[in-house]
Amino acid sequence: DEVDPEQVYYDDPHGLGGLKYPFYFGLDPYRPDKTDYWPEYLFRTIDLVRGEAEDLSVHGEIFSPWTQLLELFGYENALVYLLDEPQKCRAILAAYTEGAADLGIRQARRGVDAVLISSAFAGGGFISPRQYEQFVLPYETEVVRRIRQEGVPVYTHTCGDIGDRLERMAASGIDGIDTLDPPPLGSVDLENAKRRVGDRLFFKGNIDAVNTLLHKTPAEVRQDALWRLKVGSPKSGYILSSACSVSPRVPPENLSILVETSEEFGAPAM
C-alpha cells in the first residue's frame, strides 16, 4: 500500500549500494521528473565505448518492468502480491513500462546497435505461462514496440526454464532471445526451439556454462560449439555464447575457443 504507482518510473536493481537514481532523501515530497530523469553519464558510456572500439557491436541494456517489480518488493513478496494485489501490480508494471521504454529509446538514439531487455526471472522457476501472459507479456510488448520504432533490434534475456513459453516470448515482438539455458540448467533444446520460433527470432546462447565450459576440454567445447552453430544459424541466425553467467573458474582457453570456432564457422569460403 505504501507504493504509489505515480511515484515510480525506473529502478536499477544493481544501483551502487542499493541507492536508486534519482537519489532522494525525504526532504521534500518526491515527484520524479520524467522529462529529465537520466544522468548524462549513462549515455557518455556509450560514446566512450564507440570511440575506443569502433569495430564492436555495442548493445544497451534495460531492466524489464517485471524485473523491477520483483526488485521493488523482494522476490517472495512480489510473487505473493501478484495473488493478493494483482491490479496494484499491474499499475506499477505500467509505470515501469514508461521508464524502461524511455531509457531504451534514449540508448537507441545515442547509437547502440541493439537493446537487451533483462528479464531474468520471467521463466518457469518463478511464474507460470499464464502469469507470464498477465504480468510480463503486455508490458514487454509495449517496451519492445516503442524501442523498435527507433530502428534498433530488441532482444530479451530470460534465464532458466523457458521451454514452455518461447512462443509467448516471440509474441512480444522481440528480434531475439538470449541465454536459452539447455537441460539440466534450463529446458531449451536448440533443435526444438529452432523448429518452433527459429524463423522469427535469432538465438544467443544455449552453451551449458557449467557442464560444458567449466568441465570439458577445449576440444569438447569446440565440438559442442560447432554443433550449435550448425543447428542455430539457419533462418534468423545464431550468436554463439554461453547460456548464462560464466563461472570465474572457467578456463580462459575454453572461452577463447568459442571465438575461434565462431570466426572459423563464419569465414567466407575461399
Language-model segments: residues:
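Active-site loop segments of alpha/beta catalytic cores
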Residues: 2-270
